[in-house]
């Protein structure tokens, strides 16, 4: 009779990362928060969809706040204290996500807007008529 395979614990090790970079991608439909170390390796991440919101509610500021709190909680468990914040996109969850990171106990040293702006590249989609 075959023996069942032994289940091993999580392969992720709890590493001590004191400084990091928070990437907030805020679109009109969702907000994604990724927290990386200074080398760019992801320590924790969360999004409005992963926090349990569906559909149009993913684009709300409250959903962005919930996602940022969840990502910050996991980063704090791994010893993160100081962060730089890079914000990308035009969404409504930008400010609330930054505020949630600060309330969670992370010290913000820098906030930078890295939204890509075209120097008249591709043609824009046609206007939506409702």
Swiss-Prot record:
GO BP terms, alphabetized: translation
PROSITE patterns: RIBOSOMAL_S11
Listed SUPFAM superfamilies: Translational machinery components
Entry GO MF terms: rRNA binding; structural constituent of ribosome
Record bears the keyword Ribosomal protein: yes
One cellular-component annotation, GO: ribonucleoprotein complex
Keywords: Ribonucleoprotein, Ribosomal protein, RNA-binding, rRNA-binding
Gene3D superfamilies: Ribosomal protein S11 (3.30.420.80)
Biological role: Located on the platform of the 30S subunit, it bridges several disparate RNA helices of the 16S rRNA. Forms part of the Shine-Dalgarno cleft in the 70S ribosome.
NCBIfam families xrefs: PRK05309.1, uS11_bact
Assembly and interaction partners: Part of the 30S ribosomal subunit. Interacts with proteins S7 and S18. Binds to IF-3.
Family affiliation: Belongs to the universal ribosomal protein uS11 family.
HAMAP family: Ribosomal_uS11 (MF_01310)
Protein's recorded name: Small ribosomal subunit protein uS11
Species of the source: Prochlorococcus marinus (strain MIT 9211)
